[in-house]
From Swiss-Prot:
Name recorded for this polypeptide: Peptidyl-prolyl cis-trans isomerase FKBP1A
Residue ranges annotated for the PPIase FKBP-type domain, each copy included: 20-108
Gene behind this protein: Fkbp1a
Main localization (coarse): cytoplasm
Organism: Rattus norvegicus
Annotated PANTHER family: PEPTIDYL-PROLYL CIS-TRANS ISOMERASE (PTHR10516), PEPTIDYL-PROLYL CIS-TRANS ISOMERASE FKBP1A-RELATED (PTHR10516:SF301)
Length: 108
């Protein structure tokens, strides 16, 4: 499946991230059953990553690249685009499909 992007609210429709740019996002990560495992919103601190540098899972690389600044979307990410057969011990089980509520705040 890879990554499926479902828009929650639209962005500007013009400003999309490019490789090498820093994406500033707020996110909430959940398992398929809705159990939250991480949230930048709870920490009240946006998360930053550089697109194309493999600092995040493949589902984020491909999903966030399809979003425009200001957009909020649900990213549904299959295990092969997330943490695969290993999972993330104690947090994400093996072969888990993940759901992220991601808002692309700005690009740097």
């Amino acid at each position: 499946m890879g990554v499926q992007v479902e828009t929650i609210s639209s962005g500007d429709g013009r400003t999309f991230p490019k490789r090498g740019q820093t994406c500033v996002v707020h996110y909430t990560g959940m398992l398929e059953d809705g159990k939250k495992f991480d949230s930048s919103r709870d920490r009240n601190k946006p998360f930053k990553f550089t697109l194309g540098k493999q600092e995040v899972i493949r589902g984020w690389e491909e999903g966030v690249a399809q979003m425009s600044v200001g957009q909020r979307a649900k990213l549904i990410i299959s295990p092969d685009y997330a943490y695969g057969a290993t999972g993330h011990p104690g947090i994400i089980p093996p072969h888990a499909t993940l759901v992220f509520d991601v808002e692309l705040l700005k690009l740097e």
